Amino acid sequence: MTPMGTNYGETSGEMSNRHMNYYSLRAKGGTGLIILENANIEYPAGSNGTSQIRIDHDSFMPRYYQLVENLHKNGATVAIQINHAGASASSARTGMETVSSSNIPTKVGGEVPRPMTKEEIL
């Protein structure tokens, strides 16, 4: 199953009970590979919304562990899509400068991001 943003995340970035049920039903239905939706790797700068799940801190791992154990018990293999919103992030929402790989906005009239330096990327 390809990663699809459900927008079920808690405002804290935790996976909700709704997430747990959503993915569990797919594993029980016979899905062999489940790729979890885009998880933020740098909060708040890399966030693409208030309902995006996070994986930028160890405090989120117990919930992932619980989900993965459940999915494995139901026969599914699990992967996750990691995400940094880059130019799609909004400085109005994050309160931080928008950065990306270039200064090209993601849409016409969109916020112009600051290109990251090689040192920032490494």
Feature-to-residue mapping (PLM):
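Flavin-dependent oxidoreductase catalytic cores
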Residues: 2-122
